């Protein structure tokens, strides 16, 4: 999904409706942070709301764009945690290596701050079995999502979980990096 829906809350604050469940008409804009920054800067964003409303101008907090990124990251971390609780995540070098070699790994998560030699070994293995690898979370974030300590490698072993997680990661990447991520 390349767009983000925005609605006005009861306090007249603009809210990013990432779950697409909030009531109200709302507006949709491309979900690129750069595009949103520009539309906030030049006033386009507010004008889109004001043209449909006769009351007060909507309020946008100073941390609005950061909150969207944080919500998108929370969605990714939450899905990793849910997958773990569903038994669809293996972690630890040997378990992940084994899941790659057996073809069970649908998505490889590697901590961005893991040791270079371990990351490269996993990368080579993932490429050999054509398993997608994601390397943008630091170990602390990956560990937190999995309720463990020092997690460097994790294997998503359910294709449904891998697809859901990939979609959330893609949405976050698109928001942060814009169309270059696509």
Where is each model-derived feature located?
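Positively charged, polar, low-complexity stretches
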Residues: 16, 20, 37, 51, ...
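Short basic, glycine-rich beta-strand/loop surfaces that mediate nucleic-acid
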Residues: 128-171
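Short active-site oxyanion
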Residues: 25-26, 86-87, 105-107, 129-132, ...
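Short glycine-rich anion-binding loops that position phosphate/pyrophosphate groups of nucleotides
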Residues: 34-35, 113-115, 159-161
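N-terminal cysteine/histidine-rich coordination modules
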Residues: 1-48
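Active-site cofactor/cluster-binding pocket
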Residues: 86, 98, 104-105, 116-126, ...
